[in-house]
């Protein structure tokens, strides 16, 4: 494994030497010596890795080599960047630059000679162990091959909810009965070991039709081993009252009575997933009243937790799969479309498969991991190698004894070891995140890119391809929403995360810092070899200022529940080689981002999302290698952004502050590599800056009253690769006379469109992109019903009308309209009184939300014809709505076919 990581580092080093050959002139002799040693090194690595598991010395050699490769890259890149910074104008600058250049060149030559000698010494020691030259041979897929496989994956990867449902059907029905029909039990507990399927079972119960009809509100909170009381209470309250914007500002003393009172007055179902200890319940329980009405479904590895929470608790013991069920689940993963095709499995492969699943101990997680491993093997010899690899190291059975647990761990580890090197890198990066984290995939993709785990396609395409590979192998869980093929979030099962942490420790991949007294969650024998830090506690920042961490490449803040303060600029002084710096939600003393940030010249990723910052230093101009920059800070006053972003020519992602002061003027026209640009403002930049940004996929633009709409249209016309566009006009702009110029039909790739544009009526359907899938209209003040136009956009999957998008009295959804619509939301339409839905309209609708439409008299009668509808949310509507739509109400016939009808804040 380490060989793969070293080879990956060597590839990056060779790329750097090739790319910067012109700037490296003058040290040719030293570079030639380095290259000779690197070639010798590459020929030894494969055999070294084969001997690694049997020799601590070989393992240490590989770690030494990895350090040497990193050091060489740091030395060369630092020299190139310093040379680049010195390329100024003027005689005095030229003299100073020449003197500094000669000094730097002498130093880099000396440093390279030092690295070369260290590599030579390591090679000599490795050769003394008899390691023979073996060709390093793992081939990566080409970009074209990956795109082809990506299309196949999108077509064949099974929906997780379907593939999970093996051997649990009877258990689901039993649990639903206890929750819905039996008032004796207020707490129902699902107990069992990790990986046995407790969460899968709870999820099926949570979404069951009878459960969704029975309760008024629902909350799902994953507690896990490390939680904060405030976070758990906030999550419950947020799910029960999602539109209360004050919840995140509440402390425990405010949350406790509010949540207690809410649970006393309603019929709610709460799921507490993964509660580890009785003491955890004791910390949480103060918000739960004894009064019956609400119910709780609790999952835990400890059967005693549920009984401790409620002595009358019904404890349900999750059972392992029998051999037949295990093989059925494995088949669904390996052959996701076998039921639809004539695929016939070789008898020998089937026999091996059935034998291999016995080593999974009946645990669904292990079965799915094995299925993901076998899905990439298509011949008898390949399956035999997997079988031999499992069988030679474990003796398993169909019951959960120690041997079975060892076999499960081995299968999960095999799934990792079977990954190609580039996927191992990506998988181990998930070790940064705390247990049970929902990881935002866009951030993850940009982390990968910042560390060089990125190819010639766009960051989004590259990231999606590799994440889909990990999901397909059942190493990662992703939320594949039916409205989109894209994954927005991903997470890991806790047993798989343990494998990830174990492998990350083995590879010295990162160090997790929780607090000043506990800094070794993943700590190598030599802490200095950890080049990545993940901060899980706000108390840990001072460690960075006082420890010497000159080789750290990645620093990610991964906990948001507590305050993170940076009170000293010195925190950056010892981190000069950072590539990744995520300071999301961090608070800076005095609101100032230290000017020392400009010394982090190697940075590729910088996030200040939600950080308390009121001042950005001009030294940021030195961050010329940035690929990702998020400046969406939490500023109460408009922030000044210095005009230095124009020098960050490598940027792929840029999110600007929502509010910038009047003095801010940004020249962004040279940022031609941008793929994502958000909060671009024509008040602070010229709309013509967009002309050359032809690689843009996602654009959010705010247009001022001084904007020339003809120029806007011509600039946007060049952005033919756009997939998402949000246009926000200042409220004072009257757009009635201009919307006709705003033609969007040439955006052939545009899938998502958001418009906050004043217009008397919606444009004709021919002005919209041909494949538009999602549209959100806000504050449009349309007087004419938009539905007759929108329903003719044949590819629409979701429509949202919000806060004055329409100010008329009546809307009509006609027969045959919206043929593919899955989700519809109508919010804050204060003048809407009547909504007509004709039979045959919206035949695929699955989710409907009605929110705060005070004059709307009733739900349309035509909803009874939409048999596809699975979820109806009624939020902040009059009490009469709820009274008419509950069983026995006069309008119940309209919604009785809908499995999940929720009333949220409708008791006023």
From Swiss-Prot:
Pfam families: LRR_14 (PF23598), NB-ARC (PF00931), Rx_N (PF18052), WH_DRP (PF23559). Residues 146-459 form the NB-ARC domain. Residues 15-57 form a coiled coil. Signal peptide: none annotated. The keyword Nucleotide-binding applies. The keyword Secreted does not apply. Belongs to the disease resistance NB-LRR family. RPP8/HRT subfamily. This is Probable disease resistance RPP8-like protein 4.
């Amino acid at each position: 494994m380490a060989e793969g990581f070293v080879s990956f580092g060597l590839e990056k080093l060779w790329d750097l030497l090739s790319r910067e050959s012109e700037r490296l002139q003058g040290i040719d002799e030293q570079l030639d010596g380095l290259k000779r040693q690197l070639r010798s090194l590459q020929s030894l690595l494969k055999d070294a890795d084969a001997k690694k598991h049997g020799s601590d010395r070989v393992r240490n050699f590989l770690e030494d080599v990895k350090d040497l490769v990193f050091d060489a890259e740091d030395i060369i890149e630092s020299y190139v960047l310093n040379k680049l910074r010195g390329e100024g104008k003027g005689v005095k600058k030229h003299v100073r630059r020449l003197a500094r250049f000669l000094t730097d060149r002498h130093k880099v030559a000396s440093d390279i000679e030092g690295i070369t000698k260290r590599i030579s010494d390591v090679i000599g020691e490795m050769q003394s162990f008899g390691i023979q030259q073996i060709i390093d041979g793992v081939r990566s897929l080409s970009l074209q091959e990956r795109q082809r496989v990506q299309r196949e994956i999108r077509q064949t990867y099974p929906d997780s909810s379907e593939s999970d449902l093996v051997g649990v059907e009877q258990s689901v029905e039993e649990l639903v009965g206890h929750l819905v029909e039996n008032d004796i039990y207020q707490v129902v507990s699902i107990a069992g070991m990790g990986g046995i399927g407790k969460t899968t079972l709870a999820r099926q119960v949570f979404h069951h039709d009878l459960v969704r009809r029975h309760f008024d509100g629902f909350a799902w909170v994953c507690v896990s081993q490390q939680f904060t009381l405030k976070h758990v209470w906030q999550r419950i309250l947020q799910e029960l009252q999602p539109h209360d914007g004050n919840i995140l500002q509440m402390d425990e003393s405010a949350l406790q009575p509010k949540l207690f009172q809410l649970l006393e007055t309603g019929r709610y179902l709460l799921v507490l997933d993964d509660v580890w200890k009785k003491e955890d319940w004791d910390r949480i329980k103060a918000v739960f009243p004894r009064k019956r009405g609400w119910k709780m479904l609790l999952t835990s590895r400890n059967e005693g937790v549920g009984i401790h929470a409620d002595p009358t608790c019904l404890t349900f013991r999750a059972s392992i799969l029998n051999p037949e069920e295990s093989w059925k689940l494995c088949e669904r993963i390996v052959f996701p479309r076998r039921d639809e095709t004539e695929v016939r499995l070789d008898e020998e492969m089937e026999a091996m498969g059935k034998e291999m699943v016995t080593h999974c101990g009946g645990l669904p997680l292990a079965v799915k991991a094995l299925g993901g491993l076998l899905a990439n093997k298509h011949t008898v010899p390949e399956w035999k190698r997997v079988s031999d690899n499992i069988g030679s190291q474990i003796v398993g059975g169909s019951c959960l004894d120690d041997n079975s647990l060892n076999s499960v761990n081995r299968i999960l580890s095999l799934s990792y070891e079977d990954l190609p090197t580039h996927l191992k890198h990506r998988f181990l990066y998930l070790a940064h995140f705390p247990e049970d984290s929902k990881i935002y995939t866009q951030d993850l993709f940009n982390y990968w890119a910042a560390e060089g785990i990125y190819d010639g396609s766009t960051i989004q395409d590259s990231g999606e391809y590799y994440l889909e590979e990990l999901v397909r192998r059942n190493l990662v869980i992703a939320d594949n929403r039916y409205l989109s093929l894209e994954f927005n979030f991903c997470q890991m099962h806790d047993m798989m995360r343990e494998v990830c942490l174990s492998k990350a420790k083995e590879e010295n991949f990162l160090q997790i810092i929780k607090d000043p007294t506990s800094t070794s969650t993943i700590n190598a024998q030599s802490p200095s070899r950890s080049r990545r830090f993940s901060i899980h506690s706000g108390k840990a920042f001072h460690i960075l200022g006082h420890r010497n961490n000159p080789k750290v490449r990645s620093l990610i803040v991964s906990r948001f529940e507590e305050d993170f303060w940076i009170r000293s600029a010195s925190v950056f002084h010892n981190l000069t080689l950072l590539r990744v710096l995520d300071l999301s939600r961090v608070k800076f003393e005095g609101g100032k981002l230290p000017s020392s940030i400009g010394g982090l010249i190697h940075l590729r990723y910088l996030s200040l999302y939600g950080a308390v910052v009121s001042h950005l230093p001009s030294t940021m101009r030195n961050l010329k290698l940035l690929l990702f920059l998020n400046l969406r800070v939490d500023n109460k006053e408009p922030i000044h952004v210095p005009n230095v972003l124009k020098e960050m020519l490598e940027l792929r992602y840029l999110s600007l502050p929502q509010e910038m002061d009047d003095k801010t003027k940004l020249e962004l026209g040279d940022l031609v590599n941008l793929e994502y640009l958000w909060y671009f403002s024509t008040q602070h930049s010229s709309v013509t800056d967009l002309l050359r940004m032809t690689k843009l996929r996602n654009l959010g633009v705010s247009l001022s009253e001084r904007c020339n709409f003809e120029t806007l249209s011509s600039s946007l016309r060049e952005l033919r690769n756009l997939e998402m566009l949000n246009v926000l006009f200042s409220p004072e702009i009257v757009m009635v006379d201009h919307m006709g110029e705003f033609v969007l039909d040439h955006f052939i790739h545009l899938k998502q469109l958001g418009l906050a544009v004043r217009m008397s009526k919606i444009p004709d359907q021919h002005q919209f992109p041909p494949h538009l899938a999602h549209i959100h209209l806000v504050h449009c003040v349309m007087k004419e019903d938009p539905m007759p136009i929108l329903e003719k956009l044949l590819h629409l999957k979701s429509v949202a009308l919000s806060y004055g998008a329409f100010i008329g009295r009546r809307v009509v959804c006609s027969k045959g309209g919206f043929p593919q619509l899955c989700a519809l939301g109508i919010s804050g339409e204060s003048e809407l009184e009547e909504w007509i839905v004709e039979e045959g309209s919206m035949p695929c609708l699955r989710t409907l939300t009605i929110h705060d439409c005070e004059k709307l008299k009733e739900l349309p009668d035509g909803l009874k014809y939409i048999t596809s509808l699975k979820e109806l949310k009624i939020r902040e509507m009059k009490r009469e709505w709820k009274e008419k739509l509950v069983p026995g109400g006069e309008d119940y016939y309209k919604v009785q076919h809908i499995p999940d009808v929720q009333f949220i804040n409708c008791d006023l």
